[in-house]
Amino acid sequence: MEVMVKKKLIIIGAGGFSKSIIGSINFDEVDMVGFIDTYKKGFHQGYPILSNSIDNIDKKNDYFYFIGIGEPKIRWGFYRVLLESKLEMINIIDSSAIISKCTTLGKGIYIGKMCIVNSDTKISDAAVINTRALIEHGNVIGCCSNISTNTVLNGDVQVGSRTFVGSCSVVNGQLTIGCDSIIGSGSVVIRNVPDNVVVAGSPTRFIRENNND
């Protein structure tokens, strides 16, 4: 009988979002090693904080990595580091999530508790689909974007890279949300949203530009 070798996992970031990640890990397949965190020391959720930098991890190619930070632009920075260092990323998908077999998944993705992802959807690298989000058919979720809790994306929505869609928002079908934008919590999106803006409300209205790096 073949024995499955568990993937040794290091999570980048020891904040609140990482607690949800720990709760969704399949420990039959993953051996949680510890965290990397720029500021914290000691332990987090019972696991050691190993270092403040990937560069300080001994034999770093022996591990899989997951970005445990929800903010899209910070995720993007660590995603680029992992790519450039040729380090392996792992998907963490909660066992309660319902995902169509016709979904295309990248790497480094989080899909949280009670999420639904319907057919012909593409979720790009390092994206976050958070608790109870509903992603309908034909969606495209950009790299490092974060679809927050209880959000509904109706059919054929496209979300650009590094965009945050706040909790309990509803996005009408066939709309495009640009890159590097923020949709405020509880918003109702009835028209396309361009790149680099903050919008909020029901229906959404322009709040400000989002040009901060």
Model-identified regions with their sequence ranges:
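Short, well-ordered secondary-structure micro-motifs
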Residues: 45-47, 102-103, 209-211
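Hydrophobic, well-ordered beta-alpha structural blocks that scaffold small-molecule cofactor pockets
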Residues: 1-52, 57-58
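Phosphate-bearing ligand-interacting subdomains
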Residues: 40-98
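Generic structural signal for conserved hydrophobic packing positions in ordered secondary structure
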Residues: 13, 65, 89, 136-137
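Short amphipathic alpha-helical segments
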Residues: 22-24, 77-81, 123, 194-195, ...
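Conserved acidic residues
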Residues: 33, 63-64, 107, 161
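Short alpha-helical
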Residues: 16-17, 73-74, 104, 206
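Structural signal for interior beta-strand "rungs" in well-ordered beta-sheet cores
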Residues: 91-200, 204-207
